[in-house]
Curated annotation (Swiss-Prot):
MF (Gene Ontology): sodium channel inhibitor activity; toxin activity
Organism: Cyriopagopus hainanus
Name of the protein: U11-theraphotoxin-Hhn1a
Similarity comment: Belongs to the neurotoxin 14 (magi-1) family. 01 (HNTX-16) subfamily.
GO cellular component terms attached to this protein's record: extracellular region
Tissue-level expression: Expressed by the venom gland.
Propeptide part(s) removed at maturation, as residue ranges: 22-74
Amino acid sequence: MNTVRVAFLLVFVLAVSLGQADKDENRMEMQEKTEQGKSYLDFAENLLLQKLEELEAKLLEEDSEESRNSRQKRCIGEGVPCDENDPRCCSGLVCLKPTLHGIWYKSYYCYKK
């Protein structure tokens, strides 16, 4: 029984003494890895920043090209009176003189083509 205790104690002492020596090496390895990780993170951050700046430039360029005059003006729906000289009927509609109802109004209305 004493031999088992002595053997166990010997293994325990060796493990502790060698483990502390490795502890310093592990600490140095961890410092190197964190420094490498920081440089990698800085590189990835710069790359992401460049991509975001390019995307922002494209979006601002598209906004500057679009003006208020390029928007579609409001249109007149089906069955609504329109002006013969300036028809503002929606797409797919035509400004025509009414055939049956509305003859007495003497006005033009938007109808489907």
